[in-house]
């Protein structure tokens, strides 16, 4: 039997809700000192995470988030059918080295800072299609490894313009499944469930590559805002919704500069999301006291805010339906140095509150 789940031009509406079984967030001290510090599972004081290199540190923090998400659901690595993970480093090395010991079938992803949306989208399709009982989605970033990869060595001490964002040192991981998570207890289970309330993924809108010709690697918000606009507008059109049909629309890391551009672009399309919009990069830091300029960025920005703040907020009845839109600037060292622009992409995930029947 052919199940048609496409919705509009580029979205999918799942016939069966995809349950977020558990989630975990791991960050460093700077993120722990920010406004959301109390929401994260683990705050590590050592930016090296007990390793000798920045890259190994990022691998370690992603592994910690993945293992914690698995542990919260009372599972083992052998219970997970697939792992979708990615990061900002070349050949997704933080993910491949970080998760190698887990021995879980692995798909390495690259969507820049949109990777958490990419992993949740692919994981949800696999769950709804019956290709796994439990699927792990994870992403990470590290301030120092990203600076080393894309910008300047830390010892160089370059000046950062106000449009620049601060790469989050953090990771987020989620376990997806086709059944409601078990009730949490005080001993072994800390699942994403509050009595009968769970969080489910009900739909996705896959991002398109949008290139407005920006070439400023220190203004990622401007590169990503057109992609966020395109995806949000298509999501609203495909699902026949208004911005007010979402309690909140969370973008990944547009920052203050990108948010302004996003509002202007969506206004041109006839949408005003200003009353429901929040940006993970603007939430995770206090720009005034932490000197983060336009806000936070990185794969770990949207992922850690989702796992630490947004998903728990859904089961605590803070929001009934949200749109999670992590945003990515597809910055390549090679193409950038050859003079090419930096295209953007954004993937949207619809996450809703779900009430489990009393007998379950």
Predicted features and spans:
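Short beta-strand segments
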Residues: 21, 85-86, 135-141, 322-327
């Amino acid at each position: 039997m052919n199940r048609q789940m496409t919705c509009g031009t580029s979205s999918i509406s799942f016939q069966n809700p995809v349950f977020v079984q558990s989630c975990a967030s791991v960050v460093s001290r700077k993120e722990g000192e920010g406004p959301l510090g109390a929401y994260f599972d683990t705050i590590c004081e050592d930016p090296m995470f007990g390793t000798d290199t920045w890259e190994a540190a990022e691998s370690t923090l992603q592994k910690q988030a993945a293992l914690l998400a698995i542990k919260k659901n009372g599972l083992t690595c052998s219970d997970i059918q697939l792992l979708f993970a990615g990061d900002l480093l070349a050949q997704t090395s933080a993910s491949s080295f970080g998760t190698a010991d887990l021995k879980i079938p692995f798909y390495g992803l690259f969507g820049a800072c949109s990777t958490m949306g990419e992993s949740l989208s692919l994981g949800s399709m696999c769950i709804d299609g019956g290709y796994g009982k439990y699927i792990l989605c994870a992403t990470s970033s590290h301030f120092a490894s990203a600076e080393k990869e894309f910008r300047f060595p830390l010892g160089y001490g370059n000046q950062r313009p106000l449009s620049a964002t601060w790469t989050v040192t953090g990771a987020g991981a989620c376990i997806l499944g086709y059944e409601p998570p078990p009730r949490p207890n005080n001993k072994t289970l800390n699942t994403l469930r509050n009595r009968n309330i769970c969080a489910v993924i009900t739909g996705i809108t896959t991002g398109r590559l949008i290139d407005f010709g920006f070439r400023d690697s220190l203004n990622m918000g401007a590169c990503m805002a057109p992609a966020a606009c395109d995806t949000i507008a298509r999501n609203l059109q495909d699902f026949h919704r208004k911005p007010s049909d979402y309690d909140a629309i969370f973008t990944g890391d547009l920052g203050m500069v990108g948010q302004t551009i996003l509002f202007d672009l969506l206004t041109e399309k006839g949408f005003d999301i200003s009353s429901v919009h929040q940006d993970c990069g603007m939430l995770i830091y206090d720009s005034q006291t932490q000197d983060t300029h336009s806000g936070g960025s990185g794969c770990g920005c949207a992922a850690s805010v989702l796992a630490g703040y947004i998903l728990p907020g859904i089961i605590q009845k803070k929001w009934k339906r949200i749109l999670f839109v992590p945003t990515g600037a597809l910055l390549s060292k090679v193409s950038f140095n050859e003079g090419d622009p930096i295209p953007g992409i954004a993937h949207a995930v619809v996450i809703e509150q779900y009430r489990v029947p009393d007998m379950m």
